[in-house]
From Swiss-Prot:
The lineage of its organism: Bacteria, Bacillati, Bacillota, Bacilli, Bacillales. It comes from the Bacteria. This is Protein RecA. It is found in: Cytoplasm. It comes from Shouchella clausii (strain KSM-K16) (Alkalihalobacillus clausii). Pfam families: RecA (PF00154), RecA_C (PF21096). One of its GO terms (cellular component) is cytosol. Belongs to the RecA family.
């Protein structure tokens, strides 16, 4: 063995002794090299994300205009995690979460941890404590724009607090990012949009909270309403576009189009019908939709209703779509393996 190799082995042993097992290793020695994911709860978005869902242990930013469906997207992710036996938390900085609507989306509100903090510092400290516990699978912060620094709350209405929120987010993400990765928690930050003053060329839109969140996010989703969905003269929902504007785990700039129905959330059947039609799993002839020669219905809304009333056909079509895109179905939460990995590398290293 060469002197260089001996020196390296000695250094590695010293590092492991000082900082714990797993603090340094060769990249190929990692047990899980493939990105571990949890379904977003929406088939179209799972496909757009490229890996079948949200990557575990990563920061996700969901932003867009008001009432575009940002919180709905996050609540569907919570419902999916809970359905697979995971633990979820919701930091409601906007104090606007509707428990009735959340339960209609499939969220188990009896098991959902909810915090409605007074200040931005309190919200992020609660988030850090929950993540460092290692017992959480997903945490949603709604929203970054509502994380008001303590100094601003205690100050007068006209006081200027330049860059205070940006510094708060930058410090919080420096502390949170390592813990999020080690505990395999999915951290979803919901954000609003603002317009930069005096921009003549290019997009004037930006997100509040500084640049830190843009850098730390592995996935950034832009949610926008495209058009209203009508039944007769009544508006029953919105056609919504979700664009993956940043993606560190798969190619970015993919687009998912979904139907967000009022009081119901994202229409699973609508997404499935659109994707299945594109792949010719479901045949479309004029206004009629057919599957294996059997007619589903005339028009998109009637076909959606047929799929809703026949879950076995819906499940069969979903399986064919997932097989075509190479998605492994629903990612189960590997609790035992994660707990072991979590014990090997303690989180409260200061």
């Amino acid at each position: 063995m060469s002197d260089r190799k001996q020196a390296l082995d000695m250094a590695l042993r010293h590092i492991e002794k000082q900082f714990g097992k797993g603090s340094i290793m060769k990249l190929g020695e990692q047990a899980e090299q493939r990105v571990s994911t949890v379904s977003s709860g929406t088939l179209a978005l799972d496909i757009a994300l490229g890996v079948g869902g949200y990557p575990k242990g990563r920061v996700i930013e969901v932003y867009g205009p008001e009432s575009s469906g940002k919180t709905t997207v996050a609540l569907h992710a919570i419902a999916e995690v809970q359905r697979n036996g995971g633990q979820a938390a919701f930091i409601d900085a906007e104090h606007a979460l509707d428990p009735v609507y959340a339960s209609k989306l499939g969220v188990n509100i009896d098991e959902l941890l909810l915090s409605q903090p007074d200040t931005g510092e309190q919200a992020l400290e609660i988030a850090e404590a929950l993540v460092r516990s290692g017992a959480l699978d997903i945490i949603v912060i709604d929203s970054v724009a509502a994380l008001v620094p303590k100094a601003e709350i205690e100050g007068e209405m006209g006081d200027s607090h330049v860059g205070l929120q940006a510094r708060l987010m930058s410090q919080a993400l420096r502390k949170l990012s390592g813990a999020i990765n080690k505990s395999k928690t999915i951290a979803i930050f919901i954000n609003q949009i603002r317009e930069k003053v005096g921009v003549m060329f290019g997009n004037p839109e930006t997100t509040p909270g500084g640049r830190a969140l843009k850098f730390y996010s592995s996935v950034r989703l832009e949610v926008r309403r495209a058009e209203a969905l009508k039944q007769g003269n009544e508006i029953v929902g919105n056609r919504t576009k979700i664009k993956v504007v940043k993606n560190k785990v798969a190619p970015p700039f993919r687009l998912a189009e979904v139907d967000i129905m009022y009081g119901e959330g994202i229409s699973r059947e609508g997404s499935m019908l659109d994707i299945a039609s594109e792949l010719d799993i479901v045949e479309k002839s004029g206004a009629w939709y057919s599957y294996k020669g059997d007619r589903l219905g005339q028009g998109r809304e009637n076909s959606k209703q047929f799929l809703k009333e026949n879950p076995e056909i819906t499940a069969e079509i979903e399986r064919l779509i997932r097989d075509h895109h190479g998605l492994d179905g629903e990612a189960k939460l590997e609790e035992a393996a994660e707990e072991q990995a979590f014990e090997d590398v303690p989180l409260d290293l200061k």
